[in-house]
């Protein structure tokens, strides 16, 4: 299930994005400041390039590129 990012509280969205950009394996030695990485993800969400996916089984949200999400989830 996709969660519209504009339906989340601003603080909740920020925490979700911060969790994503600070995970092991996502920085690849990137020294870009956290605020910059968060802003990049927000722009991707605003442009529709990224989406928030909710997994009912694990009760967790994940960020994903829209192109990587099954087409049937986008309908």
Swiss-Prot record:
InterPro entries registered for this protein in UniProt = UPF0270 (IPR010648), YehU-like_sf (IPR036685)
What is stated as this protein's family in its record? Belongs to the UPF0270 family.
HAMAP family of this UniProt entry?
UPF0270
Q: Which NCBIfam families match?
A: PRK00304.1 (NF001441)
Its recorded name reads UPF0270 protein PST_1436
């Amino acid at each position: 299930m996709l969660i519209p990012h504009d339906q989340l509280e601003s603080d909740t969205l920020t925490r979700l994005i911060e969790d994503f950009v600070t995970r092991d394996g996502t920085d690849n030695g990137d020294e870009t400041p956290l605020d910059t990485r968060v802003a990049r993800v927000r722009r991707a969400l605003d442009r529709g390039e990224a989406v928030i996916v909710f997994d009912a089984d694990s009760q967790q949200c994940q960020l994903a590129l829209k192109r990587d999400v099954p087409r049937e989830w986008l309908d």
